[in-house]
Regions:
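An N-terminal, well-structured beta->alpha segment
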Residues: 1-41
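Glycine-rich phosphate-binding loops that contact phosphosugars or nucleotide phosphates
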Residues: 41-137
Length: 137
């Protein structure tokens, strides 16, 4: 029975954390959703490490619900895969620090291409946060 008690406790903790996010939603979130909905190209989601795992899930969820989307690994991007990004795409980039080297190396090319960037980062005033047209902490 202790396993069941622990499982319930874990689910209660996770549910409370999700509910706490409700109060953190603001206009930036609405702007990001609007940008994705209006996207004429694809939604490209990118991030390294644990953020990359979350990005893969975001891309898979978008694709499975009818939004053309895919995950682009930042290390692969800087070694030739940046050519897949077009100006009518929307890029969502995630990095807790906002300074992940592989990801920050992609940002200059994104700027040149003109694809709008939604930055998801905990790093206020970071390279990623500064580069995003929509910044969600």
């Amino acid at each position: 029975m202790p396993d069941l008690t622990l499982a319930r406790k874990v689910l209660q903790t996770e549910a409370a954390a999700v509910l706490a996010l409700v109060d953190r939603l603001d206009d930036r979130f609405a702007e990001a959703v609007s940008l994705v909905v209006r996207c004429k190209g694809r939604v490209i989601v990118t991030g390294m490490g644990k953020s990359g795992i979350i990005c893969r899930k975001i891309a898979a969820t978008l694709a499975s619900t009818g939004t053309p989307a895919f995950f682009l690994h930042p290390a692969e991007a800087v070694h030739g895969d940046l050519g897949v990004i077009q100006s009518d795409d929307v890029v969502i980039a995630m990095s807790y620090s906002g300074e992940t080297e592989e990801l920050t190396r992609v940002l200059e090319t994104l700027k040149r291409i003109g694809a709008p960037l939604i930055a998801l980062t905990g790093g206020l005033k970071s390279t990623l946060e500064t580069a995003g047209i929509i910044r969600i902490p």
